């Protein structure tokens, strides 16, 4: 049997911008963090331009697109304003996510089933512009099937509930959530979708999920930025890459 396809690491730099914005000014610079992550082995950079601009700002996206040597993944809500901005930036990819101003971080997956009327045209516009679109969704069959129906090239499976259950020591819930991810990744791949995953991943959970051969990209940020305070960003990227490689070595294509 053949080995699983290569697994990409997208490093999310949002919380470098969170730290910068705590005092204002330009330091620490998210672009510098992107350079460091790429030098350490990141395959791409992810940044979320939220409507309230709480961390990443418009100018950050422009600078990232202009200056980094790896693909830029532009996370965004599917609003008219954000679509306009993304089409102007022309990133390699966009990831459409749900967004509420009162949340601390993205709390759940996108309701693709309930928002087909607005998401379909947005996906079509990005496809026409040559920008790969992924939809950040729970590993739910109806959501996955609708994503394929809308001709989204990719999905990103929300791993937060699984990671939270592991952190909370709830083995039963963790197993239930893992089975959903396992089945969802297989269903998405069989539907012709490229499969990514992210949210709440640390070294251990990244290693585990890397065993799933259908998944070709992980987008990870908060854990690595937190660890970087103690050991440096380059070291955290290398450690995450090593964890993913250990998991991938156990995976073989079905």
UniProtKB/Swiss-Prot annotation:
The keyword Nucleotidyltransferase does not apply. The active site is at residues 48, 75, 199. Keywords: Cytoplasm, Pyridoxine biosynthesis, Transferase. Its EC number is 2.6.99.2. It is found in: Cytoplasm. InterPro entries: Aldolase_TIM (IPR013785), PyrdxlP_synth_PdxJ (IPR004569), Pyridoxine-5'_phos_synth (IPR036130). The keyword Transferase applies. It catalyses: 3-amino-2-oxopropyl phosphate + 1-deoxy-D-xylulose 5-phosphate = pyridoxine 5'-phosphate + phosphate + 2 H2O + H(+). 1-deoxy-D-xylulose 5-phosphate binds at residues 14-15, 50, 55, 105. It holds the Pfam family PdxJ. Catalyzes the complicated ring closure reaction between the two acyclic compounds 1-deoxy-D-xylulose-5-phosphate (DXP) and 3-amino-2-oxopropyl phosphate (1-amino-acetone-3-phosphate or AAP) to form pyridoxine 5'-phosphate (PNP) and inorganic phosphate. Homooctamer; tetramer of dimers. This is Pyridoxine 5'-phosphate synthase. It comes from Rhodopseudomonas palustris (strain TIE-1).
